[in-house]
């Protein structure tokens, strides 16, 4: 399965945080889709 995105850190640029949350949302969608 997909690997869980790693949190870039509180001091990361806003772009990295946005990218992380987008990747996390896609990751959760894939994980929950396969689980049920």
UniProtKB/Swiss-Prot annotation:
<dbReference type="GO" id="GO:0007218">
    <property type="term" value="P:neuropeptide signaling pathway"/>
</dbReference>
<keyword id="KW-0165">Cleavage on pair of basic residues</keyword>
<feature type="modified residue" description="Tyrosine amide">
    <location>
        <position position="36"/>
    </location>
</feature>
<dbReference type="InterPro" id="IPR001955">
    <property type="entry name" value="Pancreatic_hormone-like"/>
</dbReference>
<keyword id="KW-0027">Amidation</keyword>
<dbReference type="GO" id="GO:0005184">
    <property type="term" value="F:neuropeptide hormone activity"/>
</dbReference>
<dbReference type="GO" id="GO:0031841">
    <property type="term" value="F:neuropeptide Y receptor binding"/>
</dbReference>
<protein>
    <recommendedName>
        <fullName>Pancreatic polypeptide</fullName>
    </recommendedName>
</protein>
<dbReference type="Pfam" id="PF00159">
    <property type="entry name" value="Hormone_3"/>
</dbReference>
<comment type="similarity">
    <text>Belongs to the NPY family.</text>
</comment>
<keyword id="KW-0372">Hormone</keyword>
<dbReference type="GO" id="GO:0005615">
    <property type="term" value="C:extracellular space"/>
</dbReference>
<comment type="function">
    <text>Hormone secreted by pancreatic cells that acts as a regulator of pancreatic and gastrointestinal functions.</text>
</comment>
<dbReference type="GO" id="GO:0007631">
    <property type="term" value="P:feeding behavior"/>
</dbReference>
<dbReference type="InterPro" id="IPR020392">
    <property type="entry name" value="Pancreatic_hormone-like_CS"/>
</dbReference>
<keyword id="KW-0964">Secreted</keyword>
